Amino acid sequence: MSILNEPQGAAAAEDSYENELPVRRKQPGNVVVKWLTTTDHKTIGTLYLVTSFAFFCIGGVMALLMRAELARPGMQIMSSEQFNQAFTMHGTIMLLMFATPLFAGFANWIMPLQIGAPDVAFPRLNMFAYWLYLFGSLIAVGGFLTPQGAADFGWFAYSPLSDAVRSPGIGADMWIMGLAFSGFGTILGSVNFITTIICMRAPGMTMFRMPIFVWNVLLTGVLVLLAFPVLAAALFALEADRKFGAHVFDAANGGALLWQHLFWFFGHPEVYIIALPFFGIISEVIPVFSRKPMFGYMGLIGATIAIAGLSVTVWAHHMYVTGGVLLPFFSFMTFLIAVPTGVKFFNWIGTMWKGSLSFETPMLWATGFLITFTFGGLTGVILASPPMDFHVSDSYFVVAHFHYVVFGTVVFAMFSGFHYWWPKFTGKMLDERLGKITFWTLFVGFHGTFLIQHWLGAEGMPRRYADYLAADGFTALNTISTICSFLLGLSILPFLYNVWKTAKYGKPVGVDDPWGYGRSLEWATSCPPPRHNFLTLPRIRSESPAFDLHHPEIAALDQLENAGHGEKAAVAGGKEAGK
């Protein structure tokens, strides 16, 4: 029996010949060119995530070298100069080459999906921003290849330590210009994010239907535009001092304090630039695994706006011991910024309260974040008080505090986001057992490393020192901290194995929302999404459009609960008519 319109004769032979042609395989060169020239926000997001994670591993190795040096008194494996280079580049890498671009990676991948956009507003600018970040970072790190080594004046580059007399090497110039280069990429990326959020939201997505993560990306972008131009100006002025004798930061003219004001006016908003997006990730994860909508959605947005506003008023709390700042004002503003942060915790815990909690790996990391960040916040209250700060400033107490705050936010939320969105990134789920092994080894290793450093700081151990005396009494605590730091470092290995195992043996999820209770719009498209993200967009009538799509009966109940009297009558009348 023949099929209608089946080709006959020569046409059939030609068709048969075409069907027998081998399928063209992907050539490695084609794949490389595609990745190097892509303007797809998802691919660019992947590049940001992979590159920033690679820098995370490099910065972690430097941290382990420093901890190995400090395990016992005396110089073990590094000279003092090498130690200075290690702690300078460790801080620079972790803050400006890992945490900041990690935000750009998650924002690139997830934000356009959550607002129903086909891409970002300026795709080519997006790619240009990534290359600025990559090459700027490589220039800064490339100082290790120069005869005098990398920058060694601390990641904050205090003047006059960073001038041409005290830091004459080319590595310092590469650090300055590399960070300026990378910072331009961050600025351009933030312009892109703000424009995309303002101009490219799907029909029905008002500002107060946007996911919390999108709100946080928007406010982070605003902070970048406030902070990074100040850093760029300060870096160019410092380079002018070094190369052209500009005398901007001469100590005789008050330049040392001027540098600190400029740098920390960037530096403290930077803390929230690397905190707010990761608060947003936690705000996406907790409702899904609590089986509840976010408690206090409007209050959470208000708290985020308050944190962003207050973050540019507290920079001089890094400068209490200089004697050149108004202590009551900056102390009060620092205490004040704890209030909206407390509101956020109230919202997160309120969402979990009486929820149907499910501790899959993303929720486990989110819970670890809540515990760790709380510890960091408590020590922050101590440091906000000038009389107490005077005693522990520049000690390991400060090191412990900011690692609890920064690591507790960025790394815990990063792993939570990886496990939560991995099926959206790749179409496959990461292994739960390996994820929990990673969590517990990292959790124990982290707290063992840094909890002890509070006590070291209280006993008077200064930060940035390459050595100490056996008579100082710091040996036992330093040894414990170093052992736990290597456990922390080893915790990354199960995650890397998990990624490899999932890529090679993982089964495709086959559904839009493998978690079953996803609320935001990225869970209303396939895993992974098509090139322009959506084939069709669901109706957006709340801040949980994907949940409304997959659970229409609950959405109808919510609509009835939140409707006015006239709307309730209409809904009820429609139900009766349906019967």
UniProtKB/Swiss-Prot annotation:
Residue segments, region Disordered: 1-21
Keyword Transport in annotation: yes
Binding site for Fe(II)-heme a: 90, 403
Chain's gene name: ctaD1
Organism: Streptomyces avermitilis (strain ATCC 31267 / DSM 46492 / JCM 5070 / NBRC 14893 / NCIMB 12804 / NRRL 8165 / MA-4680)
Family matches, as InterPro entries: Cyt_c_oxase-like_su1_dom (IPR023616), Cyt_c_oxase-like_su1_sf (IPR036927), Cyt_C_Oxase_1 (IPR000883), Cyt_c_Oxase_su1_BS (IPR023615), Cyt_c_oxidase_su1_bac (IPR014241)
Lineage, uppermost ranks: Bacteria, Bacillati, Actinomycetota, Actinomycetes, Kitasatosporales
Annotated metabolic or biological route of this protein: Energy metabolism; oxidative phosphorylation
Bilayer-crossing regions: 44-64, 93-113, 125-145, 174-194, 217-237, 262-282, 295-315, 319-339, 363-383, 397-417, 437-457, 480-500
Assembly, per entry: Associates with subunits II, III and IV to form cytochrome c oxidase.
Protein name in UniProt: Probable cytochrome c oxidase subunit 1-alpha
Stored SUPFAM superfamilies: Cytochrome c oxidase subunit I-like
Gene3D superfamilies linked to this entry: Cytochrome c oxidase-like, subunit I domain
UniProt binding sites for heme a3: 401
Keyword Ribonucleoprotein: no
Cofactor note: Binds 1 copper B ion per subunit.
Superkingdom per UniProt: Bacteria
Broad class of the protein's primary localization: membrane
Membrane topology: Multi-pass membrane protein
NCBIfam families according to UniProt: CtaD_CoxA
Cofactor dependence: Cu(2+); heme
Record-listed Cu cation binding positions: 268, 272, 317-318
Any one biological process term the GO annotation gives: electron transport coupled proton transport
Cross-link 1'-histidyl-3'-tyrosine (His-Tyr) mapped to chain: 268-272
